[in-house]
Regions:
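Short glycine/proline/serine/threonine-rich loop/turn segments at secondary-structure transition edges
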Residues: 132, 146-147, 218-220, 251-258
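Accessory beta-strand-rich segments of carbohydrate-active enzymes
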Residues: 3-5, 9-15, 67-183
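Exposed aromatic-hydrophobic patches
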Residues: 121-127, 242-251, 256-258
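Accessory carbohydrate-binding/adhesion or oligomerization-edge regions at the termini
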Residues: 1-57, 139, 143-148, 168-170, ...
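Surface-exposed, low-complexity/disordered Ser/Thr/Gly/Pro/Asn-rich loops and linkers
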Residues: 55, 60-63, 67
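Beta-strand elements of well-folded, non-transmembrane domains
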Residues: 9, 81-85, 97, 142-144, ...
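Beta-strand-rich binding/interaction modules
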Residues: 91, 103-105, 200-248
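Surface beta-strand/loop "capping" patches
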Residues: 180-214
């Protein structure tokens, strides 16, 4: 199951400003925020037309393009969401392309399944939430509490001269389910084997590293993970059958995830 959370959300800023915004999207795009004027100028020595070199906080900024709306701080982005019956599965919310982000459900902080970054999605786990209507609230903060703000804001990912320090969620925003146990990551490392160590694979081995998702409750025994590719199916690689046998691995060595 996957449900997109696109649509209208209610927004409240720290100064009490309220509005409606569409997700995916930013406060700027939805006309929420303040005028982009001299008070937001990062370079006090820049030409602003100010007498005696003093900064006029209401003066236009002459050194870059300005935004119609700007805002730095926490934005509460809320909406009523109906959680369907998800049986024995686990329930997650994914928010992609966001700044510092937290999720509340009915006022309670949700557990972070995977911490996001400016370029990777946040994933929150809601397993245990009862089916029915709940209030979801994203706390989106582009002042980066607990993060290296200066390093972020002076990089091309957030300066007003480049991508701007927007606030919102620009990528996918969805709610989805997964089985109680699922593979969280799978890494394959091809390597050559020394001549004296060559085996029936003809000198090449694929090392496979499998990690179960955190919170797995039961461990499957005698599980086989088989990697397939067009090259294998088409017989373009030598020793295709042997390779297929090697890259099938037993799950006996899997241990419970934390």
């Amino acid at each position: 199951m996957r449900i997109l959370l696109n649509g209208k959300w209610h927004v409240v800023l720290e100064d009490g400003t309220t509005g409606q915004m569409d997700l995916p999207g930013t406060l700027d795009e939805n006309g929420i925020g303040h005028r982009d004027v001299g008070a937001n100028q990062w370079h006090p020595d820049a030409v602003l037309g100010n007498a005696a070199g003093e900064i006029d906080k209401d003066a236009p900024i002459a050194t870059r393009f300005t935004r119609r709306h700007t805002y730095e701080g926490e934005a509460r982005i809320s909406r009523k969401i109906t959680v369907p019956d998800y049986g024995t599965d686990r329930l997650f919310v994914l928010a992609e392309r966001a700044r510092a982000l937290r999720l509340l459900v009915d006022g309670e902080v949700c557990r972070v399944f995977r911490q996001g970054t400016l370029s990777t999605p946040y994933i929150f786990e809601l397993t245990g939430a009862a089916p029915g209507e709940h209030e979801f609230t994203f706390l989106s903060d582009n002042s980066y509490p607990g993060m290296p703000k200066a390093a972020i804001c002076y990089s091309s990912a957030a300066t007003d001269e480049t991508q701007t320090n927007w606030n919102g969620i620009l990528g996918e925003c969805s709610m989805y389910t997964r089985p109680q146990n699922f593979i969280d990551s799978l890494r394959v490392y091809p390597r050559a084997v020394k001549k004296e160590e060559k085996n029936k694979a003809g000198g090449y081995v694929l090392d496979v590293c499998v990690e179960l998702a955190p919170g797995a409750k039961e461990i499957y025994k005698d599980t086989k993970i088989v990697l397939q590719s067009e090259a294998l199916a088409a017989g373009e690689l030598e020793n295709t059958q042997t390779l297929t046998e090697i890259i099938s691995c037993s799950g006996e060595g899997l241990t419970e995830a934390g």
